[in-house]
Amino acid sequence: KPGFAYGGSCLPKDSKALRTLAHDLYVDCPVINAINPSNELQKKNAIDIIESKGKRKIGILGLSFKAGTDDLRCSPIIDVADALLGKGYEIKIYDKNVAISQKTNTNADFIAAKLPHLHGIITDDLDSVCSASDVLVITNKGKEFADVPAKYPHKAIVDLVRQFQTIDYEGNYEGISWGNINQNPAQNDKLVRDMATTEF
């Protein structure tokens, strides 16, 4: 589905292999060659949206590349968290699967070696992250995020995966490909009217 940057153990490796094979065979593949730069641009767009909120306390909901796994390989949100930490933002990360795997040492060595700066800010306590943050960044479609808007009605929410198809939200709700609007029928009608009068 269209949206935020991809990650995981397969797509990054497969796209690199296809680029290498095409290069070795002298085949021009502009679409395949554009995949990685486009993916990096999606990360930058996410960072820009988060920074546009003007808040310094950021809660990241989900660190693994998809819901229901503790797999951190090539997870794009790690790059986003790194960039925000480097700019002095206060980051808290909720990911129950990663937090549990840290405790059981499944991911402990990987995190210690590759992500030492993230150690200590990852938790399995969703409410503590949401309460302490001014901006909540939803990075995967975990079922536990469904109640976040209702429980925290005045937080800025950056939804990178379109967790909610429709939402009537009092706070600021924005996604990476659907603009700074609340996803409710009145706002959708306004967006359609605005697009009809826009010259491309």
PLM region spans:
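Structural/interface elements that position substrates and couple domains in central-metabolism enzymes
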Residues: 1-200
